């Protein structure tokens, strides 16, 4: 029996441009690390493609769907940066936002304003399918079965057949079943079924022999029909967020595939048949339960992006070194014990994600990957890097070695940081920053040395003149050098959890400082020069031994957050009333603070006031319990300066 026999006549309308799938490719797992990064979950599976000039190719967009009619994008994995924000222009649609173009009646349609001036016979075909529920609010109770939606699918398929539609979008439509009549839409090149409730596809899906893009993400699929192998032109297949326990065997026979998304399923293994997909350029197996990646991966020599993050891999095959075109390799959040030496063959590698594994070392052959711009091994057990490795990677701009077991800076001297602008060594066991280590790092703007064992800062700290963010929290620092005054580009300075007894007067030179965190030190007095920090927005002095605030604090006109809790304050200066921007004030747990200045009532923007465990004898308890607005009102009412 021929499943594909029908009386339908294929449309003679042709798609004027090919290669849609190739142009719609992207780097998975964007987020902080891009291709090798820790991207978001990317549950949205929207459509959208670059305008291919095929204005004559009719499109059917189901009104209950997203209204997107283009190549598969969505999530952080495929995004068309050139897509128009308003969705006008027909197929040159969207980036997975789930928005749909609407007409005055709220129905989904595809429209190009330029078509209005075209003769009727030359205008592109447009089909609008009105969903009976499209203008009604979403029900608060879940329907047992969206019968009406399934009926509308039948109508949509009929129009697809009759109108010669090439792109069909049935996404986000509560569909449970795809009718067998889908076989009549043999001219389809793009089919979007994402975000439905489909449990299985009919065998007739294999009749769509012209299909190039197929989006099935965010459904409940556990398998695929064998007939899908007839779709020999299929380029892009999206199966993210389904219930696949294995890679369906039929996929290995789709040798035309260039992009395959299998993210967030229940896959435990990858068959050796993977080697047949030699045209793949992008493969995402992220967020599955895979324990082993076999040697077949080495046959995919055209791969440029491979994402196997968030699995249970302990080893990689040496064959990974055959994938010489890889530019993005994401291995983060696995259980990797080692990285094969063959990784050094990947000379096109730009992003390599190795965060949060069980690595104790990395291979010296990584020196060959000179195109890398980011090196990130956060959350492993590495004690040292191969000699001079970072210096060999001269293109590096970001280095993250946090949460490892480093006892000292990597060997390689100042040369290893020449082009670096961000260094993160948080949560290691480093007790010293070598003198002159940043002498060539003229672009260094961010340094994070939080949670180490530093007892002092290098004498050349004054040469770090381009530093913008400096985090030295949770160390054992006893003194801040006077040369800190030279860091005049500094905006964020974190010194919490140290052993500082005083702050140098030269702190007043840091005129761009926005955040100053001195929590949990042994500070008794703040310098008067603190009032020169006019850009300061957050001043955190919690848990010190401060007995009074300098009157110059009233000059901090941009201050929004002031925390002086858990100190030995005896009073607040009247000048605190000049802090017009102040929103949050923490003065709790100051056992010697018995009264508040009436001038505090001048802080009109104050939203939060914590005075817990302060023996305020002048303000009635019921007023204190009423919150900051009531306290401020009381202060104003009892002020000797009523006119204020």
Swiss-Prot record:
Repeat keyword on record: yes
Region span, Disordered: 1-60, 82-150
Compositional bias ranges of the Gly residues kind: 26-50, 87-96
Residue windows of the LRR repeats: 164-185, 187-208, 210-231, 233-254, 256-277, 279-300, 302-323, 325-346, 348-370, 371-392, 395-416, 419-440, 443-464, 466-487, 489-510, 512-533, 535-556, 558-579, 581-603, 605-626
Bias kind Low complexity: ranges: 1-19
Residue spans of biased composition, Polar residues class: 99-117
Gene3D superfamilies, sorted: Ribonuclease Inhibitor
One matching Pfam family: LRR_8
Record keywords, A-Z: Leucine-rich repeat, Repeat
Keyword Transport: no
Role this protein plays: Acts as a Ras effector and participates in MAPK pathway activation. Probably acts as a regulatory subunit of protein phosphatase that specifically dephosphorylates Raf kinase and stimulate Raf activity at specialized signaling complexes upon Ras activation.
Record-stated family: Belongs to the SHOC2 family.
Name of the molecule in the record: Leucine-rich repeat protein soc-2 homolog
Gene: Sur-8
